[in-house]
């Protein structure tokens, strides 16, 4: 009797692991609303931003009105350096196509991306594409 229960549990594990990864189709299914260019231009200047990387790191910065910021990260992607913090110079802008675009110059690498921003309830998510329903949704926090 225990063996069938254990087998069912083990088969379900991959589904549970994937459940935390939201994609654009999930955002749309939850009635997520894409922010317009005008809404982004209202929200982004002076916004305090928290961005969560795919590796689990959280990065913090404040969008200065001049399009610049200094970011810090808790560098969770490197298990050999617990407690390590990295800083980066960055720039931000709102694209004409309705994307929030960021460039970061970390000590060992550069990062540049644009995301379409959706709001679901009180949470924000960014996606690379608004046509690919399987595009991974990255969580953001924006506050003033």
Predicted regions and their residues:
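Positively charged n-region of N-terminal signal peptides that target proteins for export
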Residues: 1-4
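Bacterial N-terminal signal peptides
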Residues: 7-14
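Lipid interaction determinants
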Residues: 17-91, 97-144
């Amino acid at each position: 009797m225990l063996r069938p229960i254990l087998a069912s549990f083990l088969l379900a594990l991959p589904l549970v692991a994937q459940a935390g990864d939201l994609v654009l189709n999930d955002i749309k299914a939850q009635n997520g609303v894409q922010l317009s260019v005008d809404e982004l231009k209202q929200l982004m200047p002076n916004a305090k931003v928290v961005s969560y990387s795919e590796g689990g790191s959280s990065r913090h910065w404040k969008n200065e009105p001049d399009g610049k910021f200094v970011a810090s990260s808790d560098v969770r992607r490197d298990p050999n350096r617990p407690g390590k913090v990295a800083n980066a110079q960055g720039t931000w802008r709102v694209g004409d196509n309705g994307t929030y675009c960021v460039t970061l110059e970390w000590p060992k690498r550069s990062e540049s991306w644009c995301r379409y921003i959706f709001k679901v309830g009180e949470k924000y998510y960014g996606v690379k594409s608004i046509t690919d329903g399987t595009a991974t949704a990255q969580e953001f926090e924006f506050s003033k």
